[in-house]
Amino acid sequence: MTFIGMLRPILYYTLTSPPSRSTLLSAAAIGLKLDIKDVNLAKREHLTPEFLKINPQHTLPTLNDNGFILWDSHSINTYLVRKYAKNDNLYPKDPAMRAKVDQCMYFDCGSLFYAMSVIFIRPILYKGKKGIEESEMYLIKDAYRVLEKMLDGKEWLVGDSYTLADISNVCSISTLELLKPFDTYPNIKEWVKRCEKNIPGYVEWNLPGVEKFRQIMKLPSSNL
């Protein structure tokens, strides 16, 4: 979608980040072209004065839409859909359905991505801890258990087609699988396959992002 006289929204991102990928997939799903800026976390580019001026929380993704600054992927994704999408399929206007999409996105940040952050990103990536104890896996197992139940008898998390709920959650769980496979959760397994097949940008952005995450974290391709 092109708006005359307006520049493309700028997205600061890193491909290893599931939230960043969810925004790339959301934009792809509505046909929105972004001016993407890769932020190198290893070089601490997210902590430079220039970036901190944009986002003092120094998180990715961060959006600059012609001077309007927004961070947190769930906030960005809903904003982009409401402003640029041709319809409300990804974020339904119906109050009940929208509330369910919101609920599922809160589940992503409060369970799936939270588990990844607590078990892996903070202690191992940032603090140098060596390895993961099996006893720490309960957060992932519990998140899988809940998501498996949420998908009972359904193809998508909310409604009859994919929404922002599916996009956010699948970007997280496809990365979490590197830590804990979900082979024993049939609903999740089939849902991830549907997401890969149907969600625009999944093959272009999410699959390479998961692989890059694996390489950076030195995880074996056969999973842990």
Segments and roles (model prediction):
Residues 88-93, 114-116, 157-160, 202-207:
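Short, hydrophobic secondary-structure boundary micro-motifs
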Residues 207-224:
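C-terminal helix/juxtamembrane-tail motif
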Residues 194-197, 201-212:
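Charged phosphate-binding loop/patch that engages nucleotide di/tri-phosphates or the phosphate backbone
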Residues 2-134, 223-224:
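GST-like domain detector, emphasizing the conserved glutathione-binding G-site
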Residues 41-42, 165, 209:
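Conserved beta-strand edge residues that scaffold enzyme active sites
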